[in-house]
């Protein structure tokens, strides 16, 4: 059986924590898209682990797989694995040979291109990790795959083909000089060959590379349980998100098949759990109809609600709303129900996990953007174009707040121990999305989760 964990909003919904909660029941945890731009925090036995590439389940002794839909920075991968080993863990991580490798020139170009876009207010809020340029090379059939690192002749041929193109892009299109502020080794075939050939040797020596689809299907044939772990969220999916303020891959559930080599009928027979943050947050630019306050350099000039900056700061501080990878403050807002309805439709949620419910505790009133108004019409889901979305006004519903309680005790006692007003809020979410509540996160630790039902 399979279960797919999907972010229903703009990323950072707490997917890693839910993977951790249900992880004991699975044998393999697979990431099917994204790269080391996807920061996630896992708390295990009181220790906190901040990861950006290694699948969350690897912290709990499960087999972790980076699928062919991922883009992999080998340097980050080995840094994270070494750090986990230094803390006494023995992570078992495999990498799809069809996954594409992030190279230094991808990261350089990511920064250059984001600077150019920022002049036109088109910046996507990239982490600068080279994710977008790597996916561009994948689509342009000029990428370097993990399997290429295992063969010296193939690796050299790939680099000799693509590196001159990257040099020309920097020098002739962006009119920049390689050297000084731009690392010359990032555009040097020999330097790249030596560095990435060494990565290939280590991958080979540690037996880390796999034919992903074959590897996973063998596990399924043996009766193993597999969890697909999505990164980011539905509303920054390159097809279903708020384009162009999106990531470069598909965090939605359909990509679990494409990004791993497991058939869509297999994924479809399993569960799809939508992870919902009890309010809204994001890093990056673009519209956000339910935004509270504003963040310099991210909130559009005509967006946000500056008169509610104190409330925004309270939620941001209580929720620790700062990027795991970048440390940037996240924009925050009330829950956006049209966004969630869109996510439920695009992913086919069979259940929901609502996180950070405790962050809103103590507020007298909690609001939800129930619908939008656009040109005098009510919309219950997101419009298809970002330009229309920017013109949407949120229609709010108000809920009575709930007190701050001993959330650890609530998690021990179960769903009925949640404050009544909090349950009313959760029931509203479940009813609107036509999916039951499987879990409620009321704190950062695994033990601070109210587990209602298991998808496995």
Swiss-Prot record:
Catalytic activity: IMP + L-aspartate + GTP = N(6)-(1,2-dicarboxyethyl)-AMP + GDP + phosphate + 2 H(+)
Full protein name: Adenylosuccinate synthetase
One record GO biological process: IMP metabolic process
NCBIfam families found in the cross-reference section: PRK01117.1, PRK13785.1, purA
List of residues binding substrate: 324-330
Cofactor note: Binds 1 Mg(2+) ion per subunit.
Keyword Metal-binding (UniProt): yes
GO molecular function: adenylosuccinate synthase activity; GTP binding; magnesium ion binding
Disulfide bonds: none
A cellular-component GO term for this protein: cytoplasm
Enzyme Commission numbers on file: 6.3.4.4
Main localization (coarse): cytoplasm
């Amino acid at each position: 059986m399979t279960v797919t964990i999907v972010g229903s909003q703009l990323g950072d919904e707490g997917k890693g924590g839910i993977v951790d909660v249900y992880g004991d029941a699975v044998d393999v945890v697979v990431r099917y898209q994204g790269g080391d731009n996807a920061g996630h925090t896992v708390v295990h036995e009181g220790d906190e682990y901040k990861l950006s590439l290694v699948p969350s389940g690897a912290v709990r002794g499960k087999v972790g797989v980076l699928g062919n839909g991922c883009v992999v920075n080998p340097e980050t991968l080995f840094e994270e694995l070494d750090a986990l080993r230094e803390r006494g863990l023995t992570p078992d991580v495999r990498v799809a040979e069809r996954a594409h490798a992030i190279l230094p020139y991808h990261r350089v170009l990511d920064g250059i291109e984001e600077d150019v876009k920022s002049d036109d207010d088109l910046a996507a809020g990239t982490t600068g990790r080279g994710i977008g340029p790597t996916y561009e090379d994948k689509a342009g059939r000029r990428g370097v795959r993990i399997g290429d690192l295992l063969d010296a002749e193939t690796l050299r041929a790939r680099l000799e083909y693509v590196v001159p193109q990257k040099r020309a892009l920097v020098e002739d299109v962006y009119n920049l000089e390689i050297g000084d502020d731009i690392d010359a080794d990032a555009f040097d075939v020999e330097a790249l060959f030596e560095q990435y050939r060494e990565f290939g040797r280590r991958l080979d020596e540690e037996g880390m590379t796999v034919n992903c689809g074959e590897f996973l299907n063998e596990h399924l044939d043996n009766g193993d349980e597999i969890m697909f772990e999505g990164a980011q969220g539905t509303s920054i999916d390159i097809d279903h998100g708020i384009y162009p303020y999106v990531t470069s891959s598909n965090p939605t559930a359909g990509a679990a098949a494409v990004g791993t080599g497991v058939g869509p009928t297999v994924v479809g027979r399993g569960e799809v759990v939508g992870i919902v943050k009890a309010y809204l947050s994001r890093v990056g630019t673009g519209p956000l109809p339910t935004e509270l306050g504003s963040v310099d350099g991210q909130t559009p000039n005509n967006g946000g609600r500056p008169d509610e900056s104190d409330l925004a700061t309270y939620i941001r501080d209580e929720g620790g709303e700062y990027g795991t990878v970048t440390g940037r403050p996240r924009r925050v807002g009330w829950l956006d129900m049209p966004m969630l309805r869109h996510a439920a439709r695009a992913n086919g949620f069979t259940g929901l996990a609502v996180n950070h419910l405790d962050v809103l505790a103590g507020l007298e009133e909690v609001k939800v953007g129930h619908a939008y108004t656009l040109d005098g019409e009510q919309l219950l889901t997101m419009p298809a174009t970002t330009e229309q979305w920017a013109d949407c006004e949120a229609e709010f519903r108000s809920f009575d707040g709930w007190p701050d309680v001993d959330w650890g005790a609530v998690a021990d006692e179960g769903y009925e121990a949640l404050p009544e007003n909090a349950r009313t809020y959760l029931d509203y979410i479940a009813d609107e999305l036509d999916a039951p509540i499987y879990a409620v996160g009321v704190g950062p630790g695994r033990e601070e989760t109210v587990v209602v039902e298991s998808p496995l």
